[in-house]
Amino acid sequence: MNWNFQNTYTELPDVYYSDTKPYDFENPRLILFNSDLANKLNLNVNSNEKEICDFLLGKKNKEKKFFSQAYAGHQFGNFTILGDGRALLLGEHVYKNNRFDIQLKGSGQTPYSRNGDGKAALGPMIREYLVSEAMHHLHVSSTRALAVISTGEKIIREKFEPGAILVRVAKSHIRVGTFQFGSLLKNKNYFNNLIDYTISRLHPEI
């Protein structure tokens, strides 16, 4: 398996992201793997389970720059700066002139985690995997799920639950909240940088 990674998002001012390292889980195990999506991304899956897990968790790309994105929005009725509190971007996989964000959800703490552990439970990650694939096959644009990986940990929620990571794929993780965050910066150049980048990446025909 090989990524064809680029990181054009980090060409934006660094207020829009923070460098993040994934937690090094000792006993990851592949629970679900979307071979159809992997083939569409030209990942050439001919590896054993451990190699697939190491590959998907970024262990084969330790020299690369991983990061979490900043954004803002409403939470519990209040407008606040949020950011990826339990997700990071491994990079942008490029295939046939198409660019896909590869994101790990539940990979550990980030600079935006606040008091959270940055991790995720297995049940919700399986549920998101199933729902995102259902949305895709119903022709509703959304993220897609490449894999669910058990971390081998027990994490504390209402009770102890098995931990997991969801590997998500999307054309971009830029969202409304990214622009809400940009507007808070009171820096016209930074905001225009974001607008120009988004148009160039997602709507070059404009």
Task: Report each predicted region and the residues it spans.
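Broad phosphate/nucleotide-binding scaffolds in NTP-utilizing and phosphate-metabolizing enzymes
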Residues: 1-126, 130-175
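ATP-dependent phospho-/nucleotidyl transfer catalytic cores
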Residues: 155-206
